[in-house]
Amino acid sequence: MNVMLTLMTNVTLASLLVLIAFWLPQLNIYTDKTSPYECGFDPMGSARLPFSMKFFLVAITFLLFDLEIALLLPLPWASQTNKLTTMLIMALLLISLLAASLAYEWTEKGLEWTE
């Protein structure tokens, strides 16, 4: 019985909040909110603005390189090895991978803004 009472209370409150959320904004439409302000921006226009795909690809490339560098920085502490040569070889391999990735992006013209 306790569970049913709790469930009914929750459903009633949720339904009431949803109804208020749909009903309340329809009461007052302010003219200040619907009119464009001094910069000319239309607040009631489309929320979908055109997005540069080239910018998106450069941003994703930056995030990938940033992630690889974040993996490189704690390498001396994470390896827990006493052999300096092993750690240096691992770091050199990771830096070589970064350099090869950058060279590939550069040759494929993935870092250029104009086509």
Curated annotation (Swiss-Prot):
Asked if Transcription is a keyword of the record, the answer is no
Membrane topology term reads:
Multi-pass membrane protein
Location of the protein in the cell: Mitochondrion inner membrane
User: Per its UniProt record, what Pfam families does this chain match?
Assistant: Oxidored_q4
- GO molecular function: any one? NADH dehydrogenase (ubiquinone) activity
Q: Looking at the record's lineage, which domain of life comes first?
A: Eukaryota
Q: Catalyses which reaction?
A: a ubiquinone + NADH + 5 H(+)(in) = a ubiquinol + NAD(+) + 4 H(+)(out)
Whether Cell membrane counts among this entry's keywords is no
Q: What class of enzyme is it?
A: translocase
- Enzyme Commission code(s) on record: 7.1.1.2
**Transmembrane residue ranges:** 3-23, 55-75, 84-104
Q: Name one GO cellular component term.
A: respiratory chain complex I
Q: Which PANTHER family match?
A: NADH-UBIQUINONE OXIDOREDUCTASE CHAIN 3 (PTHR11058:SF9)
Q: Which named protein is this?
A: NADH-ubiquinone oxidoreductase chain 3
Question: From which lineage does this chain's organism come?
Answer: Eukaryota, Metazoa, Chordata, Craniata, Vertebrata
The gene name reads: MT-ND3
